[in-house]
Regions:
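Conserved acidic donor-binding segment of nucleotide-sugar-dependent glycosyltransferases
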Residues: 317-318, 322-330, 338-343
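Conserved donor-binding/catalytic core segment of Leloir-type glycosyltransferases
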Residues: 2, 191-207, 213-216, 228-231
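Short hydrophobic beta-strand element within catalytic cores of glycosyltransferases
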Residues: 302-305
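Carbohydrate-associated surface elements
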Residues: 157, 179
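Short alpha-helical donor nucleotide-sugar binding micro-motif in glycosyltransferases
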Residues: 264, 272-277
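Aromatic "clamp/platform" in nucleotide-sugar-dependent glycosyltransferases that forms part
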Residues: 285
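Nucleotide-activated donor-binding/catalytic signature segment of Leloir-type glycosyltransferases, i.e.
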Residues: 243-265
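N-terminal subdomain of nucleotide-sugar transferases
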Residues: 1-53
Length: 377
């Protein structure tokens, strides 16, 4: 089977956690690697990156724009991207087209219609998440979903949102959860845990890093033996401005000895940090899944979250983490303080994390996707 994966606005197979690169990039990279074991897979992007061919896997960048261009400005290159695809890729030869994010969905819709190919769509994010409700984007997403043969969702939360807001036929939807790369995210039990907290994600307002800083400012009143590393680089048009706002808040709150910003890091370095940490603080407002929470659990790290959607399908309070609508809460302080000071309690929760993370495997994710393709190809 020949499979075309379209990731128009951001290039997989590179570092994640800065600009527009995040969970989508990891998702496309991991499923493409797995699918290429038994199929021919071509991944195309418009973002500048180094193309390569590795056995059955081809990654092709059409080099139309830089990584740091805002996603809004990337939209204007759509037609040029489609034209160049027609010129440089034998699109008729593919058995199935799988698009990731709404901009890729617009490209895939045209290709699938022109060559009568089955179209699979994975949103990774939804326009209804955005402040002010981006009607143009939501209207495009509705058109893409109507045109797609199958829409894959990453969580029950995402599935429910799409059904309620996009008027999609339930029979076109397939729930396939993302996985965890256990070749990377496997803990070294010989390493000693330290009083380290992590906040991992692109620096943008919807990721909620300011909420984490306010929690740390409050928590230090009851426990001051900790440090929190923020892993991720600025993303979006206001990312740099938001980062400066975060740093100023840290300075104004006298938290410089408790907080350090590390920019984005390779997954292997994130793994090494997780291996020493006792807590991941997750304050992202909107997630279709919450990959970093599953990866943290795979490293034995509990997750403190304010996300009341998809992340609660991963995290269960007092089992492998803790959910609270607000982090400024005495119960939250008690939970975190016990993780730091009660080794038996941390060990118990760590084992729960490891056990629950076994549900997530890229091998299983790719297998389910491959079965889906074969139903239509």
């Amino acid at each position: 089977m020949k499979i075309l994966q379209i990731s128009y606005h951001t290039a997989p197979f590179g570092s994640a956690g800065k600009y527009d690169s995040g969970g989508l990039n990891i998702y496309v990279e991991k499923i493409s690697n797995e699918l290429s074991k038994n199929n021919y897979v071509t991944v195309v992007t418009a973002e500048k990156a180094e193309s390569f061919v590795n056995d059955n896997l081809e990654f092709k960048s059409l080099n139309l724009f830089d990584k740091d261009l805002s996603v809004e400005d990337k939209e204007i290159y759509l037609q040029e991207f489609i034209n160049k695809l027609y010129e440089s890729v034998d699109l008729e030869s593919f058995d199935v087209v799988h698009t990731h994010y709404w901009l890729s969905g617009l490209v895939g819709k045209e290709i699938a219609n022109k060559f009568n190919k089955p179209l699979v769509y994975t949103s990774h994010s939804l326009g209804i998440f955005l402040d002010g409700y981006n009607k143009e984007r939501v209207d495009c997403e509705k058109i893409i979903m109507t045109s797609s043969d199958i829409i894959t969702t990453s969580s029950l939360f995402e599935e429910d949102l799409i059904l309620k807001n996009y008027n999609v036929d339930f029979n076109k939807m397939k729930l396939i959860t993302p996985g965890v790369d256990t070749e990377i995210f496997s803990p070294d039990s010989t390493l000693k845990r330290e009083n380290i907290f992590l906040s991992i994600g692109r620096i943008q307002e919807q990721k909620g890093q300011m909420e984490t800083i306010k929690f740390l400012d409050n928590f230090k009143k009851v426990e001051n033996n900790f440090i929190c590393y923020f892993v991720g680089g600025p993303s979006g048009k206001s990312g740099n401005e938001y980062l400066e706002e975060l740093k100023k808040t840290v300075e104004d709150s006298n938290l410089e000895s408790y907080i350090e910003f590390l920019d984005n890091l390779p997954q292997t370095e994130i793994r090494d940090l997780l291996n020493k940490s006792k807590l991941l603080i997750h304050t992202s407002k909107f997630e279709t899944f919450g990959l970093v929470a599953a990866e943290a659990n795979a490293m034995g790290v509990p997750v403190l979250t304010t996300n009341s959607g998809s992340v609660l399908e991963i995290v269960e309070s007092n089992e492998n983490g803790y959910y609270s609508e607000s982090l400024i809460d005495g119960n939250v302080n008690n939970f975190v303080k016990e993780l730091l000071n009660n080794n038996d309690k941390f060990e118990e929760i760590m084992l729960n994390c490891l056990d629950k993370s076994k549900a997530y495997s890229w091998d299983n994710t790719a297998r389910e996707i491959e079965i889906l393709y074969k139903d239509f190809a």
